[in-house]
Amino acid sequence: MGKRFIFILMACSLLSIATAVHAQHIDKQTYTFAIKKADTLKLDKYVMIDQIQGTQSKPVILFAFGGGFKGGRRDNPDYISYFHFLARAGYVVVSTDYRTQLKDIDKSEYSDLQGFSSALQQAITCAVEDFGDATNYIIEHS
């Protein structure tokens, strides 16, 4: 009798957890925040549905994907569960593009430290500019 009761109790608990998680639907919207020459820069906004109707301000997390300024994607599937976790915790998550200036780098051109250092600094400056534009877009549209 005791084992059966515990089993039923656990099954009910799991069912209620699954229902609660399912009820917390995350909405994703994609916006273009800048066009720079051939690059169209977009951002994805993740927010829990019940937070959309509210008028109370929510904290925003601006996420920068990794990739050493050579590659990466704002919508990499590996990040989505992290975005959903943060959205369920009450944050608005914004994952943004930025120009990856080192993606087409000719390694032979930058074989010396000074040449590579210059290219890296240019890539960082470009990414910072893009994050500034994304931040301005978020502020203007909040």
Identify what each model region corresponds to:
Residues 23-56:
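N-terminal cap/lid segment of alpha/beta-hydrolase-fold proteins
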Residues 75-95:
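Short amphipathic alpha-helix adjacent to the substrate-entry channel of hydrolases
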Residues 55-57, 72-75, 105-107:
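Short, solvent-exposed loop/turn and secondary-structure capping segments
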Residues 56-67:
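Short beta-strand element of the alpha/beta-hydrolase
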Residues 1-26:
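Bacterial Sec-dependent N-terminal signal peptides
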Residues 109-142:
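Alpha/beta-hydrolase active-site loop
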Residues 68-71, 93, 137:
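Serine-hydrolase catalytic-loop signature spanning alpha/beta hydrolases and amidase-signature enzymes
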Residues 68, 100-102:
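Alpha/beta-hydrolase active-site loop signature
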